[in-house]
Amino acid sequence: IKSMEWLAEKNDTTFIGQSVLHSGNAIYNTLKTIDEEKRIEVPVFEEIQMGMCTGMALNGLVPICCFPRFDFMLRCMDSLVNHLDKMQHMTEGTFKPKVIMRTSIGAKEPLDGGIQHTQDYTMSLKSMLHEVDVVLLEEPDNIFTEFQSAYNADRSTLLVEYGDYYNEK
């Protein structure tokens, strides 16, 4: 919550995703104190959501693009891997959009969401992405500084959270 409140203080940030404005997943609880004017609720259309965030970033905003589960992010790999990650190269450095992405490895406690909702693709994405940093948030003590670093960076960052931590830590 502290990280999201800090990001919300920035004039150029907007939170976009599923259940960022209305309850429906654990990420919502980290955003419910954020002014509704800073949040854009979208339906389940991950590919379009990532494209929207890339466009917002190209226009000078810093979107915080929230995907409730890592497994759902697979739906936006074209926009992430072939567009956001390659934008700087494709434009010979003219465009360098900054998107802060949040996702979560689905929780297994108190209810196991099943294999299609609890996978960790961190290492796979680290090997595919060259202009987007991928950060696994392994300890709650590092979360705030990692979000600060993502905001202060001159590139996009994917921050991967553990869903179990929403209930445990």
Which sequence ranges carry the predicted segments?
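Thiamine diphosphate
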Residues: 1-167
